[in-house]
């Protein structure tokens, strides 16, 4: 029993050291700025997000990325609140915001994936940039993610954090940070195991190559 305990402890320590070493490897992979800017399509799936979607739209409208190289496509996934009205108003004011109304489910696909698939199919950008309707993003979000995609083989997994000051929010933040750190550690060795859809970008041609979420 003691031998098994030592063996498990040794394996766990090797696992932790592997992650830590991977985190430091990211320092050598600086993002290179590309002077030739690609068109970026931001895609969002929203369902009953009347309390959050306006804040996200505000952030997206204040990006440093050139507006003529940007489009925002938001798929309203059968919302029963005022999400649709908010999206209609935003699309009427800003020509590069597009509102897609999802009326039916796809029995072979999760509802969010179906909504995202519909949005991506309408995208005209070379780069797809994903976030969630209840997220907030900094002004340099599009610029940094788009540059990173071109420097990292066509896909970039961004960092996200959970906001809030309650005990539950803080607990979630620590739990999510540990998962993200482990994934980033493996990523330093070029073996990412997952990517959160709330901060993810990739080249559209790669999405088309694998036939999307089907």
Q: Residue spans of the language-model regions?
A:
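Active-site acidic Asp-centered loop
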Residues: 77, 124, 131-133, 214
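Short, well-formed alpha-helical segments that are part of the catalytic scaffolds
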Residues: 22-31, 49-63
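Acidic donor-binding segment of Leloir-type glycosyltransferases
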Residues: 57-105
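Long helical/loop segments within the catalytic core of UDP-sugar-dependent glycosyltransferases
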Residues: 15, 96-119, 144-214
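Acidic donor-binding/catalytic loop of UDP-sugar-dependent glycosyltransferases
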Residues: 82, 131-148
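Active-site nucleotide-sugar/metal-binding loop of Leloir-type enzymes
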Residues: 91, 114-127
